[in-house]
């Protein structure tokens, strides 16, 4: 049984032992490293070298946004993109697949230069692949590299460029609108006939060309068609441009008249000519004294239908002049510069994507022009003032497995190709004299510096084993003794000799891998830390975890490492290799790798193994809905707090949600190394800092934990529920661990001060400390459900079902709560959820309790690492992944159809959506698909509210903030519907600020029914308590609600009279003994709810409105008191009463927390205050300040970009919902008018008399 199967079996075994399961979340801000600077060129499999920033922008349009906050943006690609990548085991360059692209903020970079003259800038924590003297390829952080280390660099690149046919088509595309293509008579007639069959006018309209119909027809008739029009025409009529390439002529369209038509040369000749012109050209002139080259040029020109003359001048080099069309073609295809050619030449995509034969001809042309064969250096060289061109030429040579090095001198740069192996593969020369010199050079060429394999001779001795040295070749002992360094050639000789004497085995295979020419091992000559302010980029290559960039092998971040190590909990070295159950092989039957971060691991504690299911929790306020759903699935949470910054506001928000769901916390204080090395705090000061953080967390637990757990759940150093450390460096410490190992806090300080944190990570690995804490202090499902069920399940905990749930009984009735629904193109809807009781099985018929429909389970699975593995069944206490549940929603209860359990309550979220966008399909035929997608998105994310208007085609989507809505829009686009999205619209509230004691009458349209109401504000303490989730009236019995309302300050009589609650609005029945009232009460409630959804001022939702029904006259005949009579009557009374009670507009507010260097404090406060914001608090920590501000949501659009500019990228900021405040008086009228006009209402808001008087009165 392989490793993967063993681990899968271990997972399956542990999932049946609930006492050994821990379902946990991490409450933290995720930091990400391992990135490259924007200018870094990534070597794609299609042949291109693309800057990291440009590649990110290109690929994000082909992906799905999976994460976005102030510091990080991540996209999952719909189709992976090929890139050159290193298979570390075989030491071969292969094609890897980019699956995700990342953009992050960085404030520091490390620049690394190696011996071939190339350099790269990465983040300090980025890991390079380094050849260890032991022969192993190991990982080493950028900021730990030393001069003399040998980095693994590429010598070979994957090239899957254009075929010759594709190249010919691309030529026409690039010639574009600046060239006419002249078709031979026969082809011209054929094209014209095809066009006539389609209809000239219809074709002209379809192509949407920028010329008149007559001109279009004229071009077709004459067979002289603009190249860009021909490209579109060929696609529309089914013509193959590649077939036309050899038959047509082209002319350049100048401002005055077109140039003389010429034929296109054969592709290889075209590239050779381009290489010559890049070397010796000056726009339309080629200056070169070689008669052989002159002869080649004349031949190529003749093939193009040109006759060129060689101009010879005394004392000067001979020159050939070309007509204007030739340099114009080179400009269109190769970006050949008109002026300052030497400085401006570059290698473009047309060249990098060309067939290898063509690229080889370009290199030959360039070296024929400017190259030199240097006998003294045993090298071929070429010199240019353009460093960028030579660096790209270096990468072009790697397509032929040719190593080269770059040197600077006297204002120019020289590229050298040396060493027998590279010279042999070098494309060579057409020029006979240089070709002959190269031939002679190769006869005596030896190995170059770039062919070194810097491993210890001791490795050879170990591989040789018992074979005596006398059986090896002469001078072999010099290699084994280390007197002579190994090269690839000498290593090959060693390997073949060892094989000849019968040596075999894994060690020998490893030597063979190191002798391959796919990579070279280059010495580090410079490591320099540089300050930086801006974005960095990463590209996830899932199988090989690296990609080729700038000639380096760049190690990248895997998603599973990121979820764990990035969240600051698991050491990076162990996350991928030992701890996480992550495997390179892909199971064909697996449905999806869940990006909601359900990751599992097995951890050993005191000799027992435990299955730990980690559910990642987003940190951004825009995703608070995701946090709540994650908290529903877990029993415990690791709260990560930065030692420097303290408890961040969003950490507090998430912890509050966790405690409300009865999730038990433990505390990890992160970045302790910064207190020691940066802030240089004394042990006493550090202790005070820790006590402050622990006290703050315990204060929240005291305030928000269930009464019976307020003391038990408090965290403390003594019992080990608090740990300290640095996730960045991978170490952690706790009191029990210190007692067990003898490590003291004094040792910790010394390790940090002496820059030995890596050694500390070996002594005290963070994963060991944190996961020990998890197993010891956080509950298993059986323990947790005993006290959680009464909070999260509305049924009677003492009933049979309640007891089954509390016991987490796998043999009881099925109850699974769906917390997340994702769409997978292979598996369909994948529902992830917590199984609270019973067992869910493949093929089982189940009942969706909230939707009241039956469906059948197709597959079930659990998580192993980040992957889903199939099992026959998943028992209670586990996180299950289920396919086949059609139309399932996040929050749904999955149960048995014969005897369904009472559904769990709908998941509650604190924040109501505050921002809305209008979404419209650009193409009307996409409307049904858009509606389907919007329904699906509402399923996946219950915090999204969608209003669909199938008549107008415009749909309103409301979310938690600007970022949230951007992500929703992107999800729609990536599912194939092109949409128009309006500017974000703020969702205001309407509230009353006075009391209307007068009984306001509302008459029904038939005048047979009258309702009398009073209106006043709900007590603000009650409104805030509901908004903060302290209680939910919809979950409570009438008696419970009555007591709670009185507790928060409502009058007893009012509390007893509450008939219904809509959000934070209350409808009270204060009538006594009214006949027929019970029969119309449902309609009165419906009218009240409609009025609260759309208030009188601007049809915005209401907040904190208390409506009391005090009297009524109701017609005895039911016919006269139906919905059409009662609902308008009560709404008119409510609206009239609200207007008399001084109704005003309320706007949503956000807290803004900005951490920034002190120098930028003024810029931040100015930015906040310029948005109608106020500064609430400023705290100082060293030279950093934390500014707390408050501003209206309406003013916060574009804040991310503006704050970044104002602070030059130095600000870290978060926002949090801050309730509602009255709109300033001077703005209110204008805002109401704008809202009403937007909704198609008359601009002026209504007056009380518009509702209080009789209809038509």
Curated annotation (Swiss-Prot):
Query: Can you quote a single GO CC term?
Result: ribonucleoprotein complex
Tell me where in this chain the DOD-type homing endonuclease domain is found: 273-402
- Protein's recorded name: Elongation factor 2
Query: Where are stretches of biased composition, namely Basic and acidic residues?
Result: 1237-1250
| Subcellular localization(s) per the UniProt record | Cytoplasm
Native species: Methanopyrus kandleri (strain AV19 / DSM 6324 / JCM 9639 / NBRC 100938)
Residues recorded as binding GTP, renumbered to this chain, are 616-620, 670-673
* Alphabetical list of NCBIfam families matching this protein: aEF-2, intein_Cterm, intein_Nterm, small_GTP
Q: Which gene encodes it?
A: fusA
């Amino acid at each position: 049984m392989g490793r993967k199967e063993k681990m899968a079996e271990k997972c399956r075994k542990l999932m049946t032992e609930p006492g050994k399961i821990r379902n946990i979340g991490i409450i933290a801000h995720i930091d990400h490293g391992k990135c490259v600077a924007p200018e870094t060129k990534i070597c794609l499999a299609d042949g291109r070298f693309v800057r990291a920033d440009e590649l990110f922008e290109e690929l994000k349009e082909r992906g799905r946004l999976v994460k976005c906050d102030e510091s990080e943006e991540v996209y999952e690609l719909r189709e992976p993109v090929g890139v050159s990548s290193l298979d570390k085991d075989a030491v071969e360059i292969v094609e890897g697949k980019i699956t995700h692209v990342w953009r992050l903020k960085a404030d520091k970079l490390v620049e690394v230069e190696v011996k071939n003259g190339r350099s790269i800038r990465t983040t300090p924590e980025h890991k390079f692949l380094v050849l260890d003297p032991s022969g192993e390829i190991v990982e080493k952080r950028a900021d730990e590299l030393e001069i003399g280390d040998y980095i693994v660099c590429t010598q070979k690149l994957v090239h899957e460029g254009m075929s010759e046919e594709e190249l010919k088509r691309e030529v026409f595309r690039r010639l574009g609108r600046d060239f006419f293509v002249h078709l031979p008579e026969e082809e011209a007639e054929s094209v014209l006939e095809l066009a006539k069959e389609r209809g000239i006018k219809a074709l002209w309209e379809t192509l949407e060309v920028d010329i008149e119909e007559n001109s279009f027809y004229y071009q077709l008739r004459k067979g002289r068609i603009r190249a860009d029009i021909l490209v579109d025409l060929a696609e529309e009529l089914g013509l193959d441009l590649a077939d036309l390439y050899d038959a047509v002529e082209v002319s350049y369209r100048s401002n005055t008249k077109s140039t003389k038509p010429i034929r296109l040369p054969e592709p290889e000749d075209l590239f050779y000519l381009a290489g010559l012109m890049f070397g010796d050209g000056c726009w339309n002139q080629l200056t070169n004294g070689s008669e052989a080259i002159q002869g080649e040029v004349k031949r190529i020109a003749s093939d193009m239908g040109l006759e060129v003359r060689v101009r010879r001048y005394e004392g000067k080099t001979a020159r050939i002049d070309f007509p204007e069309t030739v340099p114009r073609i080179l400009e269109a295809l190769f970006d050949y510069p008109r002026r300052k050619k030497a400085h401006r030449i570059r290698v473009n995509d047309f060249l990098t994507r060309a067939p290898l034969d063509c690229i080889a001809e370009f290199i030959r042309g360039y070296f024929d022009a400017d190259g030199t064969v240097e006998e003294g250096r045993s090298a071929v060289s070429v010199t240019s003032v353009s460093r960028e061109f030579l660096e790209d030429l270096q990468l072009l040579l790697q397509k032929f497995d040719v190593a080269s090095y770059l040197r600077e001198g006297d204002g120019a740069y020289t590229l050298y190709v040396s060493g027998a192996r590279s010279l042999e593969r070098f494309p060579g020369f057409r020029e006979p004299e240089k070709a002959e010199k190269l031939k002679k050079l190769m006869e005596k060429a030896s190995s170059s510096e770039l062919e070194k394999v810097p491993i210890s001779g001791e490795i050879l001795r170990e591989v040789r084993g018992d074979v005596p040295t006398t059986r090896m070749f002469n001078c072999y002992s010099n290699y084994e003794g280390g007197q002579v360094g190994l090269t690839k050639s000498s290593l090959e000789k060693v390997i073949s000799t060892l094989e000849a004497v019968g040596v075999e085995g894994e060690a020998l295979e490893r030597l063979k891998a190191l002798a391959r020419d796919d990579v070279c091992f280059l010495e580090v000559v410079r490591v320099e830390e540089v300050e930086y302010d801006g974005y960095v980029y990463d590209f996830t290559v899932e199988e090989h975890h690296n990609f080729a960039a700038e000639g380096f092998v760049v190690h990248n971040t895997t998603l599973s490492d990121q979820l764990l190590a990035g969240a600051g909990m698991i050491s990076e070295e162990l996350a991928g290799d030992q701890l996480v159950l992550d495997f390179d092989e892909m199971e064909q039957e697996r449905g999806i790798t869940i990006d909601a971060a359900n990751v599992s691991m097995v951890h050993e504690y005191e000799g027992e193994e435990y299955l730990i299911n980690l559910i990642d929790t987003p940190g951004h306020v825009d995703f608070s809905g995701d946090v709540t759903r994650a908290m529903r699935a877990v029993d415990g949470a690791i709260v990560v707090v930065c030692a420097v910054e303290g408890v961040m506001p969003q950490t507090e928000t998430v912890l509050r949600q966790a405690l409300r769901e009865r999730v038990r916390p433990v505390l990890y204080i992160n970045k302790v190394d910064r207190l020691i090395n940066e802030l240089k705090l004394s042990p006493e000061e550090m202790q005070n800092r820790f006590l402050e953080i622990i006290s703050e967390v315990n204060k929240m637990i005291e305030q928000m934990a269930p009464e019976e757990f307020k003391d038990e759940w408090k965290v403390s150093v003594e019992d080990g529920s608090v740990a300290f450390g640095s996730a960045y460096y991978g170490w952690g410490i706790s009191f029990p661990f210190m007692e067990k190992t003898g490590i003291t806090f004094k040792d910790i300080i010394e390790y940090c001060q002496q820059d030995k944190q890596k050694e500390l990570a070996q002594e005290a690995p963070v994963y060991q400390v944190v996961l020990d804490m998890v197993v010891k202090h956080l509950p298993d499902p059986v323990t947790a459900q005993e006290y959680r069920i009464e909070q999260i399940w509305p049924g009677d905990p003492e009933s049979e079902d309640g007891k089954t749930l509390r016991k987490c009984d796998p043999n009881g009735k099925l109850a699974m709560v769906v917390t997340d629904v994702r769409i997978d193109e292979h598996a369909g809807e994948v529902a992830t959820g917590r199984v609270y009781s019973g067992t869910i099985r493949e093929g089982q018929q189940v009942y969706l309790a909230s939707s009241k429909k039956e469906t059948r389970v197709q597959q079930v699975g659990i998580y192993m690492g980040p992957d889903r593995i199939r099992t026959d069944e998943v028992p209670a206490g586990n996180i299950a992944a289920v396919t086949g549940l059609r139309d399932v929603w996040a929050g749904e209860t999955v149960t048995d159809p014969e005897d369904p359990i009472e559904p769990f309550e709908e998941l509650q979220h604190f924040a109501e959506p505050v921002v809305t966008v209008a979404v419209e399909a650009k193409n009307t035929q996409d409307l049904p698909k858009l509606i389907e997608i919007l329904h699906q998105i509402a399923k996946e994310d219950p915090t999204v509210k969608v209003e669909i208007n199938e008549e107008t085609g415009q749909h309103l989507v409301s979310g938690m903030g600007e970022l949230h809505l951007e992500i929703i829009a992107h999800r729609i686009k990536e599912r194939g519907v092109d949409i128009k999205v309006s500017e974000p619209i703020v969702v205001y509230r309407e509230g009353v600020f006075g009391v209307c004691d007068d009984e306001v009458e509302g008459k029904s349209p038939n005048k047979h029914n009258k309702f009398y109401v009073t209106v006043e504000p709900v007590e603000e303490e009650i409104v805030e308590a509901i908004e903060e989730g302290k209680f939910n009236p919809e979950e409570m019995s009438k008696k419970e609600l009555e007591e709670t309302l009185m507790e928060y300050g409502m009058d007893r009589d009012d509390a007893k009279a509450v008939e219904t609650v809509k959000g934070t609005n209350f409808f009270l029945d204060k009538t006594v003994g009214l006949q027929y009232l019970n029969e119309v009460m449902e309609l009165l409630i419906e009218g009240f709810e409609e009025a609260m959804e759309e208030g009188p001022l601007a049809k915005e939702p209401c907040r904190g409105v208390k409506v009391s029904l005090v009297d009524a006259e109701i017609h005895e005949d039911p016919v006269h008191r139906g919905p059409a009579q009662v609902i308008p009557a009560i709404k008119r009374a409510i609206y009239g009463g609200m207007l008399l009670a001084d109704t005003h507009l309320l706007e949503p507010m956000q807290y803004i927390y900005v951490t920034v260097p002190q120098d930028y404090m003024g810029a931040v406060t100015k930015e906040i205050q310029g948005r109608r914001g106020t500064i609430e608090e400023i705290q100082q920590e060293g030279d950093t300040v934390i500014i707390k501000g408050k501003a209206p949501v309406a003013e916060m659009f574009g804040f991310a970009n503006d704050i970044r500019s104002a602070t030059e990228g130095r600000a870290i900021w978060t926002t949090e919902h801050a309730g509602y405040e009255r709109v300033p008086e001077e703005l209110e009228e204008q805002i109401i008018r704008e809202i009403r006009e937007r909704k198609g209402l008359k601009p002026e808001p209504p007056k009380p008399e518009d509702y209080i008087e009789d209809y038509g009165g």
